[in-house]
Each structure stands twice: as structure tokens, then as C-alpha cells.
Amino acid sequence: GALIGRHMDKVAEEAAAQVENAKVEEVTDANGLKAVKVTFDSGILFATNKADLNATSKNELAKFSTVLKNNADCHIDIYGHTDSTGNDGINIPLSNSRAKSVADYLKSCGVSNSQFQQITGKGSSEPVADNGTASGRQQNRRVEIYMYASQAMIDAANAGTLK
């Protein structure tokens, strides 16, 4: 666990250095290991009710793709989120489309398809702020990318060969 923790510390530092318009945090994955969570504000990524990436977003994601390519031993999950405006019939497909747009663009930048594990939308089910305010709704419209240890990284750590 300690080797993976140090490795993921480096991944977090690299992500923070490359990406200006996102929040980088260290979190714990399902295996109890350190992982990196990068949250992109959907206001930066998408126009309201749209899943098409704008030029600024593509620039940010292109920079971030370098981090993913440099850390090919990390698996990636991408989750799209919406605010509570509209119902699940609108928000779940929209959040799915946003997650897929981000994944497709990262793949077009050369990130390996094998790194992607989950690409899904959560609709408005996991708010991080109050949907009763404009600022809260803006915070809830986001895309989260999780980078975590692949089995290959865990095996390398156990074998003492993780760089």
C-alpha cells in the first residue's frame, strides 16, 4: 500500500501541475489504496444541456491526457454529474453523454482504451453543493475522473518493481 501511495502522490502532483481548471484530490479506492480524483467543472466543459466539448475544455483535457498517458498503469473511471434541474429522464442520459464525451476525447488524445474501466453518468444523485442556489447547481454540474491502481500496478508493488 505504501508504494502505491507514493506512486499516486506523484500522479496527483503531475495532474495538479498540468490542469488549471480542475480540482485534484487524493482519495481512497475500493481496495483501500490511495487514488486520485480530478473534478472538472461542467461549466468549463459543456454548455447548459449539452455534451459537446468546447475549445477550452479540449485544451484542458489534452493537457490532462498527458498525465494519463504517463501513468498507463492507472485505471480510469469517469463519472458525469448534473444539477437537480430537470428529471432523471433528462439528467441521466445527459450525464452519461458528458462522461462519454470526455472519455472519447481523451482516447482521441492517445489515452489507451484499456485504461478506461467505468464511463457512466450519475445524473443529479450525488450533489456536492446545494441545488437551491445558482452557485450550488454550478458546482454539481461536473465530470469526475478517478485514477487508481490497476492490478498490474498492485502486482508490481507486491513484487517490489513499481517505479
Positions of the model-derived regions?
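Short, low-complexity, glycine-enriched hydrophobic/amphipathic alpha-helices that associate
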Residues: 1-16
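Solvent-exposed, acidic/flexible segments
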Residues: 8, 50-58, 92-95, 99
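Extracytoplasmic
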Residues: 10, 19-21, 31-35, 39-41, ...
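Signal for well-folded cores of large energy- and translation-related assemblies
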Residues: 16, 20-23, 69, 107
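N-terminal post-signal-peptidase region of extra-cytosolic proteins
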Residues: 20-23, 63, 102, 130
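Surface-exposed patches in mature extracellular/periplasmic domains of secreted proteins
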Residues: 24-28
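Periplasmic peptidoglycan-binding/anchoring modules of Gram-negative envelope and division proteins
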Residues: 45-79, 107, 145-147, 152-163
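Periplasmic OmpA-like peptidoglycan-binding domain that tethers envelope proteins to the cell wall
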Residues: 81-156
